[in-house]
Swiss-Prot record:
InterPro entries, per database record: MetalPrtase_cat_dom_sf_prd, YbeY, YbeY_CS
Top-level division of the source organism's lineage: Bacteria
Protein name: Endoribonuclease YbeY
One Gene Ontology term of the molecular function aspect: metalloendopeptidase activity
Entry annotated with the keyword Cytoplasm: yes
Alphabetic keyword roster: Cytoplasm, Endonuclease, Hydrolase, Metal-binding, Nuclease, Ribosome biogenesis, rRNA processing, Zinc
Alphabetical GO biological process terms: rRNA processing
Any one GO CC term of the record: cytoplasm
PANTHER family assigned: ENDORIBONUCLEASE YBEY, CHLOROPLASTIC
Stated role: Single strand-specific metallo-endoribonuclease involved in late-stage 70S ribosome quality control and in maturation of the 3' terminus of the 16S rRNA.
Binding of Zn(2+), residues: 125, 129, 135
Record family assignment: Belongs to the endoribonuclease YbeY family.
EC numbers: 3.1.-.-
Amino acid sequence: MNILIDNRQDKVDAINLEELVEKVIKTVLEVEEVIDNVEVSVSFVDNEEIRKLNKYYRGIDKPTDVLSFPLAEFEDTYGEVEEIEEDSEEVQPIGDIVISLEKALEQSMEYGHSFEREVAYLTAHSMLHLLGYDHETEEERKIMREKEEEVMARLNIGR
């Protein structure tokens, strides 16, 4: 498994986040029983950079906490990635995650939990998007929330 992490901001201290993000990604893959010959790219950015990305890709001109860019195609069921070949030894990219550490810090203070907990949650949330989950409907939202909570519980990260 390859996890590529790029800190492209200097407004929030990112020390110790790499190990946390790697643990979250590995846990999501375990929960979803996805093989480990995958590659995920994670970029830490500030609010200005994520605002620009959000405007370009989603037409929303404001900062958001996390953006997910899946590279794999999915079958009709969650987490079953068609393009990942289980027998292949070649590492296969499944997508990119972009997290605004500035927004994560703001939200951690707003919600009254640690910054690390917020980054872990955003990573789990985004990984589930990379694996085909969404929250457009109430049913999808419920399923995704249960998966997020399972990942956070396995990591022993509470609110």
